[in-house]
Amino acid sequence: MAKKTVGLLVMAYGTPYKEDDIERYYTHIRHGRKPPQEQIDDLKARYRAIGGLSPLAKITEAQAKQLEKRLNEMQDEVEFCMYLGLKHIEPFIEDAVERMHADGVKEAVAIVLAPHYSTFSICSYNERAKAAAEKLGGPVIYTIDQWYDEPKFLQYWSEKVKAIFDAMKEREREQAVLIVSAHSLPEKIIQAGDPYPAQLEDTAKRIAEQAGVTHYAVGWQSAGNTPEPWLGPDVQDLTRQLHDEQGYTSFVYAPVGFVADHLEVLYDNDIECKQVTEEIGARYYRPEMPNTDPLFIDALATVVLKRLAKEGDEHE
């Protein structure tokens, strides 16, 4: 008997594929409002500073393919079939749902490549996927709200952080601090009771505990260029503050809200934060991003299988 096919909808933010895509990509992010030329030029300069266009597109596709492969290795009951849906560039989330529907997929598990829940991020992806499926009359989509607390995800980061601290001489370690960060969001999410900031705090606490790190702080990065207040402190300001007030001279940055090498990490951390550490005479460290690391892919696969099992349990 043929195995049942289950769709695997992997959703991510998306990134420009080539320089010509930058304008339309950021216009989509800005809800159809074209960015000023000055902003486009600045973005092009940032991409060039990290060696050309972001590697994110290739990494996202590789993560999705590896996840599909791992899921089909881990169990033999269903055949997972992967569909990639992006938020701000093709293939859009709606395109992926349409393809699932056209292929006759009846049910799918959806996972967003972002560990923490927020109405701005995971919620908006899931709503778009469900709305598209509803419009077409299928498939049924089982969404995942968050997965930051999956043990293998925390293990990935705590092992990487521990390795950096372990390699330091004792004196340096005493003056080193871990900065755990995620993408900043508008402050108004707090008034709405969004769990996003608390989830990042929880992630930082668990990683620090597992890595045996006593000095750590939570920061935010890559805030949008809008007049409204965004979550802070920004990682650059936090770096200066920790140096000035507590005398730290080594900084280990763990941008755990992201899962791959891309502009926010390769520029905002590896260029901007590094410049700050150089200005204050401190050392800069940043663990490797998860990308397609087998432990990270295992974490995602475990989350997907748990979600499918939960659906099965509820129908028994």
UniProtKB/Swiss-Prot annotation:
<feature type="binding site">
    <location>
        <position position="30"/>
    </location>
    <ligand>
        <name>Fe-coproporphyrin III</name>
    </ligand>
</feature>
<dbReference type="GO" id="GO:0046872">
    <property type="term" value="F:metal ion binding"/>
</dbReference>
<keyword id="KW-0479">Metal-binding</keyword>
<keyword id="KW-0456">Lyase</keyword>
<dbReference type="GO" id="GO:0006783">
    <property type="term" value="P:heme biosynthetic process"/>
</dbReference>
<feature type="binding site" description="axial binding residue">
    <location>
        <position position="13"/>
    </location>
    <ligand>
        <name>Fe-coproporphyrin III</name>
    </ligand>
</feature>
<dbReference type="InterPro" id="IPR033659">
    <property type="entry name" value="Ferrochelatase_N"/>
</dbReference>
<feature type="binding site">
    <location>
        <position position="264"/>
    </location>
    <ligand>
        <name>Fe(2+)</name>
    </ligand>
</feature>
<protein>
    <recommendedName>
        <fullName>Coproporphyrin III ferrochelatase</fullName>
        <ecNumber>4.99.1.9</ecNumber>
    </recommendedName>
</protein>
<dbReference type="Pfam" id="PF00762">
    <property type="entry name" value="Ferrochelatase"/>
</dbReference>
<dbReference type="GO" id="GO:0005737">
    <property type="term" value="C:cytoplasm"/>
</dbReference>
<feature type="binding site">
    <location>
        <begin position="46"/>
        <end position="47"/>
    </location>
    <ligand>
        <name>Fe-coproporphyrin III</name>
    </ligand>
</feature>
<keyword id="KW-0963">Cytoplasm</keyword>
<feature type="binding site">
    <location>
        <position position="183"/>
    </location>
    <ligand>
        <name>Fe(2+)</name>
    </ligand>
</feature>
<keyword id="KW-0350">Heme biosynthesis</keyword>
<comment type="function">
    <text>Involved in coproporphyrin-dependent heme b biosynthesis. Catalyzes the insertion of ferrous iron into coproporphyrin III to form Fe-coproporphyrin III.</text>
</comment>
<keyword id="KW-0627">Porphyrin biosynthesis</keyword>
<dbReference type="InterPro" id="IPR019772">
    <property type="entry name" value="Ferrochelatase_AS"/>
</dbReference>
<dbReference type="InterPro" id="IPR001015">
    <property type="entry name" value="Ferrochelatase"/>
</dbReference>
<comment type="similarity">
    <text>Belongs to the ferrochelatase family.</text>
</comment>
<dbReference type="GO" id="GO:0004325">
    <property type="term" value="F:ferrochelatase activity"/>
</dbReference>
<dbReference type="InterPro" id="IPR033644">
    <property type="entry name" value="Ferrochelatase_C"/>
</dbReference>
<feature type="binding site">
    <location>
        <position position="54"/>
    </location>
    <ligand>
        <name>Fe-coproporphyrin III</name>
    </ligand>
</feature>
<feature type="binding site">
    <location>
        <position position="125"/>
    </location>
    <ligand>
        <name>Fe-coproporphyrin III</name>
    </ligand>
</feature>
<comment type="pathway">
    <text>Porphyrin-containing compound metabolism; protoheme biosynthesis.</text>
</comment>
<keyword id="KW-0408">Iron</keyword>
